[in-house]
């Protein structure tokens, strides 16, 4: 079962990639519905490209989340992980003049993974899973961040992510820091299958 799958339309005919060779791939829309395991595997295997919803409602949802965080920052509100540390450091407030620097510093701090690197397929699964989570509209991220993750998947520019590193409630801070590091140009990536 592939959820959210659409086919590119040429005139009156809907076609899939098998009908026209390697010219295009089917597109999986990520954001309005949860992805199935089969969806994640298909994107990881590069059987599908991904896209974000075009609906006004979805785009407004994403913008409202980002606007909410921006307003809370202007009001100098306390936002876990934005104006505070993470985990046991959640009670440590970050001075407002350092708030914009915190995400970069946290990605560097948590970039302490060990072990073998995840293979390209597994790293792609990590990226599409995070994209799906963020694109649901509950995280306050910008549309431009989501668009960059879509670009990474569709262009097959995927962060190199070590296989070991996180322990904790979510267990994902270390691997996700490698996505953030790649987004700002500070981490290695797989480009066309090679590091």
Where are these regions (language model features)?
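A cross-taxon signal for low-complexity, glycine/charged-rich
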Residues: 3-5
């Amino acid at each position: 079962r592939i959820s959210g799958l659409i086919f590119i339309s040429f005139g009156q005919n809907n076609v899939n990639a098998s009908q026209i060779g390697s010219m295009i791939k089917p597109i999986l829309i990520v954001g309005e519905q949860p992805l199935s395991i089969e969806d994640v595997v298909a994107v990881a295997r590069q059987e599908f490209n991904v896209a974000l919803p075009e609906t006004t409602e979805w785009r407004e949802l994403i913008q409202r989340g980002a606007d909410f965080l921006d307003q809370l920052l202007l009001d100098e509100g306390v936002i876990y992980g934005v104006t505070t540390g993470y985990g046991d450091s959640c009670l440590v407030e970050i001075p407002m003049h350092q708030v914009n620097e915190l995400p970069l510093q946290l990605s560097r701090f948590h970039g302490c993974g060990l072990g073998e690197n995840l293979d390209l397929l597994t790293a792609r699964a990590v990226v599409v899973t995070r994209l799906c989570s963020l694109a649901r509209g509950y995280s306050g991220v910008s549309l431009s961040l989501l668009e960059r993750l879509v670009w990474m998947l569709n262009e097959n520019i995927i962060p190199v992510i070590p296989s070991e590193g996180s322990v904790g409630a979510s267990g994902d801070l270390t691997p996700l820091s490698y996505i953030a590091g790649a987004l700002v140009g500070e981490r290695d990536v797989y480009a066309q299958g090679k590091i």
